[in-house]
Amino acid sequence: MKFKFNSDGKFKILLFGDIHEHTDYKTNPRFKDMQKLMTAAVEEFKPDLCVLLGDNCNTDIYTEDPEKFREMLRDVVAPITSRNIPVAAVLGNHEHDHGHEDEIVADYGKLGIIMRNDAPAKVTGNANFKEIIYSSDGEKPVFCLWFIDSNNCHENREISHYDYVHTDQIEWFEAESEKLKELNGGKPMPSFIFQHTPVPEEYELLRKAHFWELPVAVRGYNTKKKTFYVGKKGTMDYVGEGPCSPDVNNGQFASWKKVGGVLGAFFGHDHLNDFSGFVDGIFMAQHKTAGFRAYTDGCRSCVRLVTLDEKNPHKFEQQLKRFKQFGLKSESLGPVMRTFTDRQVITMHVLGYLALAAAGVTGIAFLIKFLIERFGG
């Protein structure tokens, strides 16, 4: 498939994180809610490409009944494929759980989902590949989309819980990037990175929380668990949990800066986070689940639309839109989770009521009101 900018010079990419669908989907209202969101999103945004950011379907069934897995995957993406919209996907850590990665990659391809391995077989990972977006006339390569396999858990959990993108993958990326420079007049081709597990530099979008911010702060993950974080000034949207990045920094982000041209990186993996911001000039965006199967905190399941402009490929627009913002009503969540939109809103409202009831002091009321407005939305 050859991607190119539309006649209006735009190219729209719609992102879905961590759907985690299960084999009982045909009778489960959580699947219906996910499909409501996916359907509403593709109908409203009319994307040129959809991207699934890993942990898309439960692979526990694969050993016993691979056909049931294929049927589930086919039904999950039906709102996209039935509208003849291309869809690409990366492998999440759970697609690696049972040792069927090569078969799963092949099954994605057979269903028309873009997933393959362009890297040499000796390179770590089962699905490292790229797609080029051409000019609207189809003649000139303009933009590159990288799809990187971020692997599973580290083989030594004392070093890191989650694995990272390995050195040989980084070397492959750098070598391929050099080839793209030749196609782009000797300059780095502007590009995006799509992968499941975030890089450690994502923590640079956060800062250590002050004690009065602890009700809305998140605990860091694994080796950072003794520290509580909130978003830095300039970090957009919702920090719902400590980013679950590797504990070892293997230099992937440094490689992006070295190669040049990487405008943004988009991750799944963390089911509550949808925050984003710039680190050293690279836009990094975390994607919470677009489904209702994984742990979540209300009707905040969302999608992200990224729009490229052929006339200015080094700039892009992006927006989040959540389940309730589409005017949808959940069939799978209880009344509390349907009413409140996230953990922080619930926490701050409870704290507000308790503080006001106990103290009745204007100063405390003002502080609680400020915290609700600042952090609770």
Region spans (language model):
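Active-site-proximal beta-strand elements of phosphoester/diester hydrolases
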Residues: 10-23, 142-152, 194, 283-289
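Hydrophobic alpha-helical topogenic segments used for membrane insertion/localization
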Residues: 350-372
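N-terminal active-site segment of His-dependent metallophosphoesterases
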Residues: 1-70, 74-75
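Extended active-site neighborhood of metal-dependent phosphoesterases/phosphodiesterases
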Residues: 1-5, 70-186, 213-217, 305-307
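Metal-dependent catalytic neighborhoods of phosphoester/phosphodiester hydrolases
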Residues: 25-30, 54-77, 95-113, 205, ...
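Binuclear metal-dependent phosphoesterase catalytic core
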Residues: 2, 7, 130-134, 237-238, ...
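His/acidic metal-ligating clusters that form di-metal
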Residues: 45-49, 144-146, 159-270
